[in-house]
């Protein structure tokens, strides 16, 4: 994802594209990267629209879809159609498992909070030199890998073992703690290797651990694959603040429509825990805020930059003298907004809307 988005950003800057076009190009790069990496073209599109563009429009939707499809096609031509891991969980979901899903969603949300805050803790150390930061990453990762070698690489083999239920509780917890710490350290200090893969591994192993801890307390047996998949989706949705993309990824990875309902419930609880209880917005938003960017404000400015002045220009204007009773004049009745000026040589001091006037007179 980062490689695709970064490459697209550099290309757009080299071409001198305007900001709104550059944002669309970055979204295309991110969608293509996700699609090529995980063979999930739909999730790539939804992630780009949900996190980067933050709106669903035809202008942005079509190029993102094309980029995502091309990413999947090229990846399959080069590497084949085999996916990195097969999550085929064609299992039924019983109502008795709902309490487990609620508690699991809460725990996944807390894990996402821990990851986000640890990431931001290391992100604040960017004032140190790149060489020093990368040296620390290498040394710490190597030392931890001596004791927990499962943290190295993509971790998909470990995730496959968790799905098959062959890992012990101790190993699962060690992988969760070690992978969470090392990934937060590496990404926080500037060595971005992606967040989607690690979040899937952390969430999946945590889900595998939860079913071993609390599965026997439930009135019905819980398939380890069910809990692992819930963890994958909830952790991805909460960490990236992309619940819709995580839900679509569930459908594409599991090939099981039955998993949509439990995934929705778990992701909602995890995201609410992250945002409402701990006030976090996910890794990307927190990082942008720390750098002084208001993503919502920037999004609004981006929308206004795409609107021409002629399309919002007010044609009907009327000149009303100060302290007069001309607001009842025919010229004023057609106005929605009345500009307030001190004199014709002075700029506009403000505006009075028709709603303000009607509310003032109790009409």
Where do the language-model regions lie?
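The conserved cystathionine-beta-synthase
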Residues: 314-342, 350, 355-363
């Amino acid at each position: 994802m980062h490689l695709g988005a970064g490459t697209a950003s550099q290309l757009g800057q080299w071409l001198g594209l305007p900001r709104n076009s550059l944002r669309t190009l970055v979204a295309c790069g991110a969608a293509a990267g996700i699609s090529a990496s995980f063979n999930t073209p739909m999730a790539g599109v939804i992630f780009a629209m949900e996190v980067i563009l933050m709106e669903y429009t035809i202008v942005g939707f079509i190029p993102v879809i094309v980029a995502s499809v091309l990413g999947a096609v090229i990846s399959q031509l080069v590497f084949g159609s085999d996916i990195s891991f097969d999550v085929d969980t064609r299992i039924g979901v019983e109502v008795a498992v709902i309490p487990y899903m609620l508690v699991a969603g809460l725990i996944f949300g807390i894990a996402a909070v821990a990851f986000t805050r640890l990431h931001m803790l290391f992100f604040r150390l960017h004032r140190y030199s790149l060489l020093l930061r990368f040296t620390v990453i290498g040394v710490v990762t190597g030392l931890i890998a001596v004791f927990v070698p499962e943290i190295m690489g993509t971790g998909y083999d470990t995730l496959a073992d968790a799905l098959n239920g062959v890992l012990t509780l101790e190993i699962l917890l060690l992988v969760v703690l070690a992978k969470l710490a090392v990934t937060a350290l590496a990404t926080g200090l500037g060595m971005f290797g992606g967040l989607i893969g690690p979040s899937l591994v952390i969430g999946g192993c945590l889900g595998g651990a939860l079913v071993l801890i609390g599965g026997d307390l439930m009135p019905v047996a819980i398939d380890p694959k069910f809990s692992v998949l819930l963890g994958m989706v909830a952790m991805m949705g909460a960490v990236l603040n992309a619940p819709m993309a995580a839900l679509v990824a569930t459908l594409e990875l599991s090939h099981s429509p039955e998993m949509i309902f439990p995934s929705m419930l778990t992701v909602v609880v995890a995201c609410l825990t992250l945002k409402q209880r701990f006030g976090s917005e996910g890794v990307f938003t927190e990082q942008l805020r720390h750098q002084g960017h208001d993503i919502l404000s920037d999004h609004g400015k981006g929308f206004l930059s795409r609107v021409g002045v002629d399309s919002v220009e007010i044609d009907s204007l009327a000149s009303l003298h100060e302290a007069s009773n001309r607001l009842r004049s025919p010229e004023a009745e057609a106005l929605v907004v009345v500009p307030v000026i001190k004199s014709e040589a002075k700029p506009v001091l403000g505006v009075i809307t028709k709603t303000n006037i009607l509310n003032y007179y109790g009409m």
